[in-house]
């Protein structure tokens, strides 16, 4: 490349930068034209690096100024408000000023309009806003939709708004901050529709209705009008401010560890309360606005399928995102209480899990049942043939074992006396034994996707996927390769480490002596175990002798949520299961992420696991390598401890209330085999995995269960 070419390239690039700011150049003196006036063209002197512009010849042959045309940047197409839509439906309406009250600095105008023989009034701080509210009331009178936008859609008119709400323009202007918010110029822009820390969730927060009972429980739901796209380049706070000016946002709470704070903001729109959470007040405020837009105006800002909640097949007592965010906050809040606001050395963790119980339609009455942490399994040399060591200290597994303690306590409460029966979550079943009361539901929270099939294919937050540099469009496709052989495979955890590996075809049986001689002790992944719970229930084999199968109503992830991968891991891969015993089913719970995704926990995973069950005074800390506490004592969650609880309940339950007749159990293993229907369901599950080509379930050496009850 010669020198002349280089100079041309340099001048060309400089010219582009300069042209970009031509309109913003201030006049240097009185002879220099201002913005929009004629701009003198360069003659090339003075060492200017800009490229010469072609001169235009006047009639006398002299050069003249070429007028710079100012480009108009088209603004976003806004959705038509009620006033505009009513005018299209009923042109020529007359609005009358009825009254003006209030002080000069804060007047209140009342306007009226007559439509179809009815007079509608609206009030506001300006005549324009008063007319708008009157028009909204008029629209509601003859259109069966809750707001103007839905009325517009119902009458066959569509809003053609070409938007890209994930563009870089969707950041907050400083003018919309509350007084207590200070914009951080170094923060990257967040994108509506992502699921990471700097972004919005799958469907945002969705508010609780003013009524405690969802309409879907009492009457058939009305058809939901199709959502319309939002104006481009505008964030939820800006959009809501245009639709409902003057709203006040309230700061509710602040929680979380120092590196992963969570703030909660609220706003009231049309008498309904909405809240949102985020890693700063700005994001929390935006999510509260997003919630209001979704509920009041049917304006959904994120339609990415893989980040949407996967609804359950059963009765849905709660709005999905409200439930997910509430469960997350409750578990994190309880863990904070148990660890002195995360200051305890045992607050260190990679994964946090918990079980929350709801007893009705209001999530405000939800109760944390268990909290746990952990990411490791026992070393083979520490196996116990007396049931005194915990094999698997992964957080979600420990949370479920803690839940078993609670279920035993509730059964004992029922068996105490008639007064306590009302307090218990159990009631007698007409089919024999006991069952949960109708409104009782359990929800599993895990701070990240469970190890195994659910996590292996979603290692990053969705916001990082599908990014195209030319369009800045954040798109996250569904699983591109759903039929690959690796999808759905059974996987086992690595002994004394982290991560999982696929099962071997010949590794379904482990031997006690083989493990003691150095063979790796294999433990099924958390994804596989949760899939198992979705068939045989979370109560396990021993409790199934007393109670009907119990299933999780929802599984909520704090991060790395991907609807396609999670639903496959939890139940889709075994949809071929058949011939299950009565009352057993393939459970399909609600699957959801949370609005404010948990921050990644950096650093090495601790070697301990923490557990707590409601009623416990303090947490229990277990060495994951040995399966016991640091003093070598067995855990309150070990097989032997839970078998003692089972024996105690068995001694109290009248024989006619047993779902399975068992007289004198001798060993832990025999007691488990007595739960015949449970064992049949488990066998069908293992067969379903094999038939689907996903591998064989690997069980622990049978010697682990050959122990008897010793008080």
UniProtKB/Swiss-Prot annotation:
It is an enzyme of class 3 (hydrolase). The modification Phosphoserine is found at residue 149. Zn(2+) binds at residues 394, 451, 526. Transmembrane segments: none annotated. Its EC number is 3.5.4.37. Residues 83-88, 104-105, 237-242, 259 are annotated as: Interaction with substrate RNA. It catalyses: adenosine in double-stranded RNA + H2O + H(+) = inosine in double-stranded RNA + NH4(+). Residues 370-707 form the A to I editase domain. Keywords: Hydrolase, Metal-binding, mRNA processing, Nucleus, Phosphoprotein, Repeat, RNA-binding, Zinc. Residues 78-144, 231-298 form the DRBM domain. The active site is at 396 (proton donor). This is Double-stranded RNA-specific editase 1. It comes from Mus musculus (Mouse). The gene is Adarb1.
């Amino acid at each position: 490349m010669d020198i002349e070419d280089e100079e041309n390239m340099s001048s060309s690039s400089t010219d582009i930068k300069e042209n970009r700011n031509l309109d913003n150049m201030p006049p240097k003196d009185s002879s220099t034209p201002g913005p929009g006036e004629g701009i003198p063209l360069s003659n090339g002197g003075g060492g200017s690096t800009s490229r010469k512009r072609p001169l235009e010849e006047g009639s006398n042959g002299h050069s003249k100024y070429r007028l710079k045309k100012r480009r108009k940047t088209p603004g976003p197409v806004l959705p038509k408000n009620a006033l505009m839509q009513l005018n299209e439906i009923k042109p020529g309406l007359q609005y009358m000023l009825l009254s003006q009250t209030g002080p000069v600095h804060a007047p209140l105008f009342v306007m009226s309009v007559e439509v179809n023989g009815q007079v509608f009034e609206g009030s506001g701080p300006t005549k324009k806003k008063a007319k708008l509210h009157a028009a909204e009331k008029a629209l509601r009178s003859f259109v069966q939709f809750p707001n103007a936008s839905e009325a517009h859609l119902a009458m066959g008119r569509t809003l053609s708004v070409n938007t890209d709400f994930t563009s870089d323009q969707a950041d907050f202007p400083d003018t919309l901050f509350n007084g207590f918010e200070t914009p951080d110029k170094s923060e990257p822009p967040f994108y509506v529709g992502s699921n990471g820390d700097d972004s919005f969730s799958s469907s945002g927060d969705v508010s609780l209705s003013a009524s405690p009972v969802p309409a879907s429980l009492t009457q058939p739901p009305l058809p939901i009008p199709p959502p319309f796209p939002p104006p481009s380049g505008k964030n939820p706070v800006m959009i809501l401010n245009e639709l409902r000016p003057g709203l006040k946002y309230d700061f509710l709470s602040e929680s979380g560890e120092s590196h992963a704070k969570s703030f909660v903001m609220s706003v009231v729109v049309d008498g309904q309360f909405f809240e949102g959470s985020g890693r700063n007040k700005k994001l929390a405020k935006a999510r509260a606005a997003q919630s209001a837009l979704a509920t009041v105006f049917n304006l959904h800002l994120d339609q990415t399928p893989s980040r949407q909640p996967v609804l359950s097949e059963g009765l849905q007592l709660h709005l999905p995102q409200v439930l997910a965010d509430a469960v997350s906050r409750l578990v994190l809040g309880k863990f904070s209480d148990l660890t002195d606001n995360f200051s305890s050395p045992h607050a260190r963790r990679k994964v946090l899990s918990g079980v929350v119980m709801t007893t009705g339609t209001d999530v405000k009455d939800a109760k944390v049942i268990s909290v746990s942490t952990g990411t490791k399994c026992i070393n083979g040399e520490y196996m116990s043939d007396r049931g005194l060591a915990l094999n698997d200290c992964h957080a979600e597994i420990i949370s479920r074992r803690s839940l078993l303690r609670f279920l035993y306590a509730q059964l004992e409460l029922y068996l105490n006396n008639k007064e306590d029966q009302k307090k218990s979550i159990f009631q007698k079943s007409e089919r024999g034994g006991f069952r949960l009361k109708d409104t009782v539901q359990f929800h599993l929270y895990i701070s990240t996707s469970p190890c195994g099939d659910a996590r292996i294919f979603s290692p990053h937050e969705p916001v990082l996927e599908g990014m195209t540099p030319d369009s800045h469009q954040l798109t996250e496709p569904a699983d591109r390769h759903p039929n690959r052989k690796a999808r759905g495979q059974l996987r086992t955890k690595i002994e004394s480490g982290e991560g999982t590996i696929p099962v071997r075809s010949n590794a379904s049986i482990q031997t006690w002596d083989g493990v003691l001689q150095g063979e790796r002790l294999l433990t099924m992944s958390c994804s596989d175990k949760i899939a198992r719970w979705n068939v045989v229930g979370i109560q396990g084999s021993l409790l199934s002798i007393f109670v009907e199968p119990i299933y999780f109503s929802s599984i909520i992830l704090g991060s790395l949520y991907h609807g396609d991968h999670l639903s496959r891991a939890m139940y889709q891969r075994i949809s071929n299961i058949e011939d299950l015993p009565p009352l057993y089913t393939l459970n399909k719970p609600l699957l959801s992420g949370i609005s404010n995704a948990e921050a990644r926990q950096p650093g090495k995973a601790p070697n301990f696991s923490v557990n707590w069950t409601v009623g416990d005074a303090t947490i229990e800390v277990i060495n994951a390598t040995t399966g016991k506490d640091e003093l070598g004592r067995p855990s309150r969650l070990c097989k032997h401890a839970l078998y003692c609880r089972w024996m105690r309940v068995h001694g109290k339950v009248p024989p006619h209330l047993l779902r399975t007749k068992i007289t004198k159990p001798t060993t832990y293993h025999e007691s488990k085999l007595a739960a015949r229907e449970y064992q049949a369901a488990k066998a069908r599950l293992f067969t379903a995995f094999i038939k689907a080509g996903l591998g064989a379930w690997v069980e622990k050496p049978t010697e682990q269960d050959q122990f008897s009850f010793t008080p």
